[in-house]
């Protein structure tokens, strides 16, 4: 009995370090009030950027960081040497967008914003260099995972759009041994591509979180930033299919607490409005299923007169209002400017 017990303890002692070594990068998105966050394997700390204090909510795993769509982003540092020489890696990221990114109205096509990655991509996907990885989200809702194997680019591009207002657990397995790159969303394979055999090309040390590496702005406001929740980012050595089974601990909360803007003298203290973002032209008041509904122009990404959504607030009594998910959002090529005005009919 003692021998069995001793062997069990020894086995655990050997097994536990193997598990810890298999995790090469771990970045929880639990940001302190002073803007500090950590990469937990190296224990390096970084400061997030933003016009206001960072905002966190209960996340898929622990706390999640709420990015505002116009000013929030992070440039962290990872050690690319821990990825060097690897032929099999697993990348994992939790995302819950409120809206799709902005784009310039004088240009066609879909613009892409880096949710997280170290590939130097601009908004039109022009690439500087031939190395690195990135999870990207487009202005029409397309999403993709990009990586390099033996210096050759591989793109996994699902046909469906990335769901808003819900957790998307994005997992990419890059297998340079069996020549396959697969992207999963919430445990289901959504795209797969053949790659060349060889080592994964790790890219540089700068990790772009919530913004592409280029500086695209209108005045002081970024155009290529992400609006929504980000939670744990991890890179594992090897192909880790067990990661696909992970479930979110909490539903995503994309509204802001009223306390966030309590000191804003330009914000009405008694007025039905969204919890954040740009709003204008309230229309379409109606009573339906026991609640009052009001619709309005809303730009969840920030103070932009383009890519407008059709916002939605509801009330039981006409003085206390809560925000619902946007009713209509620009997603197709003809929706460049978004939803400008309208009305509501009940049938």
Locate the predicted segments by residue.
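Beta-strand-rich interaction surfaces with strong enrichment in secreted/lumenal proteins
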Residues: 78-81, 157-161, 196-197
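Extracellular glycan-recognition modules
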Residues: 24-42, 46, 60-61, 69-146, ...
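Short strand-turn-strand beta-turns centered on an Asx-Gly dipeptide
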Residues: 184-187
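Short, aromatic/His-centered strand-loop micro-motif at the edge of beta-sheets
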Residues: 145-169
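Flexible glycan-contacting loops in extracellular carbohydrate-active proteins
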Residues: 60, 193-229
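Carbohydrate-active catalytic/glycan-binding domains of CAZyme proteins
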Residues: 232-234, 239-347
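Localized edge beta-strand/strand-to-loop motifs within extracellular or lumenal beta-rich domains
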Residues: 166-182
